[in-house]
Curated annotation (Swiss-Prot):
This is 1-deoxy-D-xylulose-5-phosphate synthase. GO terms for cellular component: cytosol. The gene is dxs. Homodimer. GO terms for biological process: 1-deoxy-D-xylulose 5-phosphate biosynthetic process; isopentenyl diphosphate biosynthetic process, methylerythritol 4-phosphate pathway; terpenoid biosynthetic process; thiamine biosynthetic process.
Length: 615
């Protein structure tokens, strides 16, 4: 195999074009093989193989810096930069990351995971290069979905102003995770149509020259005028950025030729490359949304694998039903329709649904505008992505106490996506915001109750739930919930475990049938149930959460006890002050000491060693 001979990008420069083409197919096979075992971002990486090979053939990594936005498309990059022998560990605990990571390889120019960051990073690098008198190329590879992000567009504005030498490669596959939205996406499609027209014109060029040179000259002058008009329309020219394309992102020879030419140019240049997401794997080409990030599968008989009924689906079903009951309900998502469980909702209530693209800040402030005019918006968003709209939560929603509901998916440890995606900071950054209330349901039925009640409380509410399966709640059932009140699930005589969110199942498992240990579903963090907390203060208390210990639920409990002048023995379990890498969720919980075993150890340290009765 040719891949066996490739240990660094330098090895690509010694291969013939024919060998590079064979290598592309070998890389696709390896990507399919490993993602079939481990899961991962399959379709994006399959679509970028030729582009990655061309970039590493032309440029000199790691001296030249090649940045991959998000990192979904970087598997081929990992395979040709000395990590092929570890590629089988992709996304596994102790293995290589599913994204680019500076600490993993000198060829990874940035640590990625969130969208739209590559252009600002690249701008910083070219500024440093020029100030330090160095000479190397900086290439930022960004998808058409990530380019819709406000951070990317703002960076383009500055890149055009400063006119520094750099190359932007727009990898246009018409997708982010869901289908792309917005005016810029429509423009890219129009450019592709124009490219098709230009190709058709080539067919008639020689015919016109033979029939009438005069007629050909007239047509040629008209085309030059049209080109000038096109340049005036092109938004990249308006930014002061040279635009080249669109070109075929699977034409390896053509890509190498174009990149060699662009390498010699001064100033900022954008190369528009059109690729097919899932290229070379028929099922992924046909359904790039599902095969964007599938779980494990049989590569010989690839079929969609049921992930069971998830919290995301429970949320989607609940809001779809709620929208039939509440005509002012409106749901927004930042490019995560499928991931947030909103396919059904978007089909049944298209007029009250908005995908703003990869623009979390826009989602939150648009929700504020809706609320100001009497609507009841729900922002469906992952915990890790809500970080990107923190100012909007405060400035546009909370200050005016607007009735916006934040449905925070993927709260807590999320597993194989690792440090950039764990939702373990939202409690700390949200509970300090005045007016904003925070809750976490124990099951799908309680989620329905919280969503319905949240639309009635009159201010901002955050409801957080994990990446996990959950038992389906019956449709049409909307139980009442005592807002701000906790729930005792098991009485105890010596100690109580106060569990917030997902850790409740661990608390019940740890307590077992020991009569000394009680368990509380501490489902409301803000407001805390101070009445129950006061009543429980005569017992030993252990708080548990799937969140950073610092600033989390346990901290809130300690603050409340201090304010009430109560001093029970309290231990706080949560994530320590470090970033957790990728791995299986149960294993990462075990590392953090927040699983059932960790809870039992903490109880034992408090003098309450749990004893289970034998049947």
């Amino acid at each position: 195999m040719i891949l066996d001979k490739v240990n660094s990008p330098e090895d690509l420069k010694r291969l013939s074009l024919e060998e590079l083409l064979l290598l592309a197919e070998e890389i696709r096979s390896e990507i399919i093989r490993v993602t079939a075992q481990n899961g991962g971002h399959l379709a994006s990486s399959l679509g970028a193989v030729e582009l990655v090979l061309a970039l590493h053939r032309v440029f000199d990594s790691p001296r030249d810096r090649i940045l991959f936005d998000v990192g979904h498309q970087a598997y081929a990059h990992k395979l040709v930069t000395g990590r092929k022998d570890r590629f089988h560990t992709l996304r596994k605990e102790g293995g290589i990351s599913g994204f680019t990571k500076v600490s993993e390889s000198p060829h990874d120019a940035i640590t990625a995971g969130h969208a739209s960051t590559s252009l600002a990073n690249a701008l910083g690098m070219v500024l440093a290069r020029d100030l330090m008198g160095e000479d190397y190329h900086v290439v930022a590879v960004i998808g058409d979905g990530a380019l819709t992000g406000g951070m990317a567009l703002a960076a383009l504005n500055k890149i055009g102003e400063l006119q520094k030498r750099m190359l932007i490669v727009l990898n246009d596959n018409e997708m982010s995770i869901s289908e792309n939205v917005g005016a810029l996406n429509k423009y890219f499609k129009e450019l592709q149509i124009r490219k098709w027209v230009q190709d058709a014109e080539k067919l008639g060029k020689n015919i016109l020259e033979r029939i009438s040179p005069q007629l050909f000259g007239l047509v040629d002058r008209a085309k030059e005028a049209a080109k000038l008009l096109l340049h005036q329309e092109n938004p990249f020219y308006a930014w002061g950025i040279r635009y080249v394309g669109p070109v075929d992102g699977h034409d390896l020879k053509g890509l190498v030729h174009i990149l060699e030419h662009l390498k010699a140019l001064d100033g900022p240049t954008l190369l528009h490359v059109v690729t097919k997401k899932g290229k070379g794997y028929k099922v992924a080409e046909a359904d790039p949304i599902y095969w964007h990030g599938p779980p494990g599968f049989d590569p010989k008989k690839p079929e969609k694998v049921s992930k069971g009924y998830t919290w995301s689906q429970a949320f989607g079903d609940a809001v779809t039903e709620l929208a039939h009951m509440e005509p002012r309900l409106f749901v927004l998502t930042p490019a995560m329709r499928e991931g947030s469980g909103l396919v059904r909702y978007s089909l049944e209530h298209p007029e009250r649904y908005l995908d703003v693209g990869i623009c979390e800040d826009v989602a939150v402030t648009t929700a504020a505008g809706l609320a100001l005019r009497g609507m009841k918006p729900i922002v469906a968003i992952y915990s890790t992505f809500l970080q990107r709209a923190y100012d909007q939560v405060i400035h546009d929603v909370a200050i005016e106490n607007l009735p916006v509901v934040f449905a925070i998916d993927r709260a807590g440890i999320v597993g194989a996506d690792g440090a950039t995606h764990h939702g373990v900071f939202d409690i700390a950054y949200l509970r300090t915001v005045p007016n904003l209330q925070i809750a976490a349901p124990k099951d799908a039925l309680e989620l329905r109750a919280m969503l319905k009640k949240a639309l009635e409380v009159g201010g901002p509410v955050a409801i957080r739930y994990p990446r996990d399966n959950v038992e389906r709640a019956p449709e049409g059932v909307w139980p009442e919930i005592a807002w701000g009140k906790w729930e005792v699930l098991k009485e105890g005589t010596e100690a109580y475990i106060l569990a917030f969110g997902k850790t409740l199942k661990y608390a019940l498992e740890a307590a077992g049938d020991d009569p000394r240990v009680g368990v509380v579903n501490a489902r409301f963090l803000k407001p805390l149930d101070r009445e129950m907390l006061r009543a429980l203060s005569r017992y030993k208390l252990l708080t548990v959460e799937d969140h950073q210990r610092m600033g989390g639920f346990g901290s809130a409990v300690l603050e409340a006890l201090n304010e009430m002048g109560l001093k029970p023995e309290v231990q706080v379990l949560g994530l320590p002050d470090r970033f957790f890498e990728h791995g299986a969720i149960p294993s990462l919980h075990r590392q953090a000491g927040i699983d059932a075993e960790g809870i039992r150890k903490a109880l034992a340290a408090m003098g309450v060693a749990v004893v289970h009765e034998r049947a």
